[in-house]
């Protein structure tokens, strides 16, 4: 791979942030369109989404309890699958009044989360034959030049790749417009691993109850590569239009 030919470097969640910006109006209508007292106006929300996208491009650190909760759960599952102790989070057992182990407590970023042990074991069993946190990358040709797409796949199994999600509320097709089921299968395909199936394995976490769901997608190169290319090229248009706001030189393959 000749890195000097690469014009841009994009990670999958950057494409998601760009999609959220493009769909600002639809997202606003979904959550606050019928609210008598919305937390912000539609124009204010679009400005907020724009800034979120710029921050994502620039890799500005952000604080999110929901993101930390997902990271902690992912790490617990990874450690169970790999039969190892975590170097990222502090984990301890949660017991009931009889001393029975009923959960796992994780401390991450000075936040404490508890997960039912039954849930942790169920999810880890599902991934017992998968490779956790597999780095992938591949070049995507575009009208602007070559773009390096890269990222970490949560779990790679022989016939399917997986992205583990945690959410407080799930609805069918929630991740249909996300980029992972295009970017990661594309990277594997370009590296000679033809793994067509992709799953979003979703854990809906309530205060007392939990539920698991699966969204499955099939990567079809003839259909999906043009979709991915258009998405990436539209993002490049945006980045070049606002280049003066971009401080992350890695985006332009300058470091």
Where are these regions (language model features)?
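Non-catalytic C-terminal interaction segments of nucleic acid-processing enzymes
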Residues: 233-255
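Secondary-structure transition/capping residues
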Residues: 84-88, 195, 209, 246
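Mg2+/Mn2+-dependent nuclease catalytic core
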Residues: 137-241
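A sequence-level detector of short, solvent-exposed, charge-rich linear segments
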Residues: 86-96, 180, 247, 251-254
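Generic alpha-helical secondary structure signal
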Residues: 12, 25, 32-35, 97, ...
């Amino acid at each position: 791979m000749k890195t000097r030919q690469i014009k841009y470097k994009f990670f999958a969640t950057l494409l998601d942030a760009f999609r959220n910006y493009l769909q600002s109006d639809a997202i606003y209508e979904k959550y606050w369109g019928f609210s008598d007292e919305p937390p912000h106006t539609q124009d204010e929300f679009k400005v907020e989404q724009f800034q979120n996208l710029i921050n994502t491009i620039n890799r500005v650190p952000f604080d999110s309890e929901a993101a930390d909760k997902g990271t902690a759960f992912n790490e617990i599952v990874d450690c169970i699958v790999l039969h190892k102790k975590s170097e990222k989070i502090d984990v301890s057992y949660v017991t009931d009044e009889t001393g029975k182990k009923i959960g796992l407590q994780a401390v991450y970023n000075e936040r404490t989360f508890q997960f039912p042990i039954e849930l942790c074991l169920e999810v880890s069993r599902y991934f017992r034959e998968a490779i956790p946190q597999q780095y992938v990358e591949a070049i995507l040709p575009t009208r602007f030049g070559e773009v390096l797409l890269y990222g970490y796949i949560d779990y790679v199994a022989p016939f399917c790749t997986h992205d583990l999600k945690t959410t407080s509320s799930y609805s069918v097709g929630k991740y249909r417009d996300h980029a992972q089921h295009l970017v990661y299968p594309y990277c594997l395909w370009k590296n000679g691993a033809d793994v067509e199936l992709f799953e979003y394995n979703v854990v809906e976490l309530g205060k007392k109850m939990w539920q698991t769901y699966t969204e499955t997608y099939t990567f079809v190169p003839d259909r999906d590569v043009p979709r991915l290319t258009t998405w990436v090229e539209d993002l490049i248009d945006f980045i070049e239009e606002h280049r003066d706001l971009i401080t992350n030189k890695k985006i332009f393959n300058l470091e």
